[in-house]
């Protein structure tokens, strides 16, 4: 098979960017409902056409690569659907309303953003999962922030920054384990070495969030009172429902599978719906049914579809609205289409051609790290999956780092700096799509405020430029 040139390989990426630009410009937030997916499929068709007509790639090879890509994210799709049900159950079961009710009274608005980042960081370190952190405590923090008058971009940015700090440094994180294993670096050696770039990034982020918090004009206490009163009117606020996040935390600490943990958490929240919020379920069920049938129908509708309960204020009505598993379907569809594109580019040799282009710029330390960062970012854009990007980046540069005498921990750190934390900043990446869907905040809205994620690759390059704590394992040949 002939290998396409980097210029030809970049053509589908350029076409995708142009198509997405006009699609988002025309459809806005509705682009996720089908427009973006069509853009990805059209670009996939372009890749396949180029590969089959000019480079001798068979459709069977392309199809096989696409199937492998989709198989690789199958567990993520299941998690997404469960998260949709969990988010609805936590809201309508009174878990999130109770957390918000007490949270707005405990967390001072001046310290909210920095507290938001720190809380998510701690939870994510303990759980090893940014997705679980954002889908649980992140949703509650969004509600608290809105009640205190913060813009949703700032709130989501603080949540994303904290959650991905924890995801990056936690020994329980799958990306942390993957980056260390792919580069043959001991896990805790990898984690310790990441601190030289991770700590400056998170400290700068916390300073920015602190300044932003003190610059924020807090909502009138009467507005917060209206908010909390509205929650108390709609839901039965009780400490008993907080057993759900407590049990969830215990399961996570015991390293129970993410799918099992989320499923049990959802089931417990459903019990809370039945015990503490039966009136809410009857309202969701609507007229025509009563008794146990109404409760059963309410649970089914809540977990599977959208609900919109009327509250005392429009803001509160919007906050307590849920989308269930059905609300995740656009994201699932988008991920499937993104995997099609990644598979087609892989089968046609385009990803390999582009990544080899980055390898040419690896003559000195700074350029080697910069090329690794650029390659990781590109793969995140092209494959739409952080796991694939970590594997490809690590395998591609492993020999180069060894040849130049750089320690494997430098490659593992740079890979995480470039891939793990930037994945939620890309609208069509699995992480970007998921977090935007869970928080109900478009990726491009929270992107400017996700300071930790933006700073990490820049700090990584800067540290390489000054040569801080970078040694060669052997002399260069």
Regions found by a protein language model. Give the residues of each.
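Hydrophobic transmembrane alpha-helices of multi-pass small-molecule transporters
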Residues: 1-79, 196-206, 213-337, 477
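Alpha-helical transmembrane segments of multipass membrane proteins
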Residues: 17-21, 48-49, 118-122, 143-144, ...
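Central hydrophobic cores of alpha-helical transmembrane segments
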Residues: 135-141, 159, 261-269
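C-terminal transmembrane helix pair
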Residues: 10, 182-198, 202, 343, ...
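Transmembrane-helix bundle segments that line or gate the permeation/cavity pathway
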Residues: 159, 164-172, 198-219, 463, ...
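Helix-coil boundary and interhelical linker segments in multi-pass alpha-helical membrane proteins
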Residues: 142-154, 440-444
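Membrane-embedded alpha-helical segments and adjacent helix-loop junctions characteristic
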Residues: 55-146, 305-398
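Short helical (or helix-break) motifs at transmembrane helix termini and adjacent helical loops
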Residues: 131, 163-178, 391-400
